[in-house]
Amino acid sequence: MMRASLLAALLALAPAATAQTQADIPALRKEAKADPAIKAALDDKTRTMDARLEDDGRMVEIILKAIDAKPGERAIDIGSGSGYLALLVSSMVGPKGHVDMHNTPGWINQFPTMEPERQKIRIKQPNIGWVTTTWTDISGAPNSYDIIVMGQVYHDVFLEGESNDAMNERLFAMLKPGGRVVIEDHDAIETMPLAQQVGLHRISHGDVAGQMIRAGFTLKTMTLLESTHDDRRFNVFRPGVRGRTDRFVAVFEKPLK
C-alpha cells in the first residue's frame, strides 16, 4: 500500500471531533496572548533577551496554548536544545510541577552548550531536570508524564537515522492516559518521499499524524500555520524562507483506555 493510501486509512480512523484548521493566525495569537498563564510565562523576568527575540517568529503563544500546561503537571521537552520551550512550560507548571529537558548525545557533542552541567550554570529553576539519550532510547516510568513536547525536532529523528515508530512506542508508554503530545514542525509536501522531506528539515503534518495514530495516539487538533513566504520545495534554512516557513502544531492524546 502506498504511504499516502495508508495515511488516508489511518486518518479515517480518527474521531470525527478531530479539528484540522488553517489558522486565522492574528486571531489565534491574540487569544493565546490573553491567557494569563501564557502571559505570565512570556513575561517571566528570568527569560533572556535571546529567548524573547525568538517569540514573535515562533508565534510561541500558539504553541503554548496547544501545550495547555497546568500547575503541578509533569512534562518532557524532547530535543530541547537551549531549553526555549522547556523554560516556558516550567513557568506554567509551577513549583509543584516538573519539566525534563532532553537532548541527544550527538547534539551535545555537536553543540557543547547543550551539555547538562553547562546548562545548569544558566538554568536555575528548581523544577527543571535533564535527560540525555538517543531518540529511540528515551524512556521514563510508565504513565509518568502529562505532557510531551517536540518543537521543530520531530523530523530530526528520521534525519539522524533513527525510527520515529520506535520512539513513538516509548512516548506512548511514558505518557499518562489522557496525556498529550504536542508536535510543532516545518510542514512539507506530503507526496514527497519522506527521506527527501526530512533532508529539507521538514516533515508533512499528514505523515506525522499517520505515524502517531499508528502508535496508538488520538489526533485531537491539527493547526496549520501557513506563510506567504514559504516554498516547501526548499530547505527551511534557505534565505528568504528561514524563520517564515509553513508550520503545523499538532496535539495528540493517549486514550484513557
Language-model segment annotations:
Residues 34-64, 70:
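Class I SAM-dependent methyltransferase Rossmann-like catalytic core
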Residues 83-87:
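Glycine-rich SAM-binding Motif I of class I
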Residues 133, 138-148:
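A short acidic, Gly/Pro-enriched loop at the edge of an enzyme's catalytic core
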Residues 146-165:
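A short SAM/SAH-binding and catalytic strip from SAM-dependent methyltransferases
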Residues 178-186:
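Conserved beta-strand signature within the Rossmann-like core of class I S-adenosyl-L-methionine
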Residues 231-257:
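Core SAM-dependent methyltransferase catalytic element
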